[in-house]
């Protein structure tokens, strides 16, 4: 299944990077990258979760609507969903996104029922439930499956977009690190940059993996713990409890 995800991710990445390069030939001036990277990440997430059960025309619409949902979570917002408020717009956006995700769940069920092979997370979910030996719950409605994908999609936009942008900036700020990443790519892929990346090649990209981990350590996209006020200085000796 991981190879399916990798193929989807690479296809989307190549598509967006090619467009960026084409746009740069027309206008090479510096531009903000946040929304550009976010759009690529949104399409990547949708393809991994829903495959091509989501049409191309819907991706841009979902991307725009999800931004309204993100805006509604700002710290200072009018809390009552009156028309025109960010919270109201987010509620309407959620309804539209859910309709697309429910449609994707329905199409996935039809595809697997007709003997199709899994090509995304939804397909794999439906396929596993259809296996004779599966003893778990099987009666998930399209709406329930869409809710799960909606949650995954929100998490991917919150954390992954931030991590992607931070990683890009860290490479831009550290050209010597970028040069090492490129040397490793040339070695692992032997200069064949047009060939699809394989899982084995990904495993061999040890330096790239280290760069990603270090980027997340230096600038965590999402903090998993609350900040604490420390009265006394930290000790340089770190004790890790067993439990």
Task: List where the protein language model places each region.
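Residue-level "edge-of-site" marker
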Residues: 165, 228
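Short glycine/serine- and small hydrophobic-enriched flexible loop segments
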Residues: 47, 166-173
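N-terminal start-of-chain detector that recognizes signal peptides
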Residues: 74, 96, 217-225
């Amino acid at each position: 299944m991981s190879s399916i995800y990798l193929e989807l991710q690479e296809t989307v990445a190549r598509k967006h990077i090619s467009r960026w390069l084409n746009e740069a030939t027309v206008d090479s001036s510096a531009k903000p990258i946040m929304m550009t990277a976010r759009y690529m990440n949104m399409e990547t997430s949708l393809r991994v979760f829903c495959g091509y059960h989501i049409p191309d025309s819907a991706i841009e619409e979902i991307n725009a609507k999800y931004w309204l949902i993100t805006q509604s979570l700002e710290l200072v917002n009018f809390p009552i969903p009156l028309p025109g408020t960010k919270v109201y717009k987010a509620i309407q956006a959620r309804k539209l996104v859910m309709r697309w995700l429910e449609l994707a769940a329905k199409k996935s069920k039809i595809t697997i029922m007709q003997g199709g092979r899994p090509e995304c997370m939804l397909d794999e979910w439906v396929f596993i439930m259809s296996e004779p030996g599966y003893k778990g719950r099987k009666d998930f409605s399209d709406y329930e499956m869409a809710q799960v994908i909606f949650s995954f999609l929100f998490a991917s936009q919150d954390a992954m977009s931030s991590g992607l942008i931070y990683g890009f900036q860290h490479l831009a700020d550290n050209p010597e690190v970028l040069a090492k990443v490129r040397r490793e790519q040339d070695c692992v892929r032997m200069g064949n940059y047009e060939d699809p990346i394989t899982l084995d090649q990904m495993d061999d990209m040890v330096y790239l993996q280290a760069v990603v981990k270090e980027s997340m350590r230096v600038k965590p996209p999402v903090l998993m713990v609350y900040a604490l006020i420390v009265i006394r200085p930290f000790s340089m000796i770190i004790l890790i409890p067993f439990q």
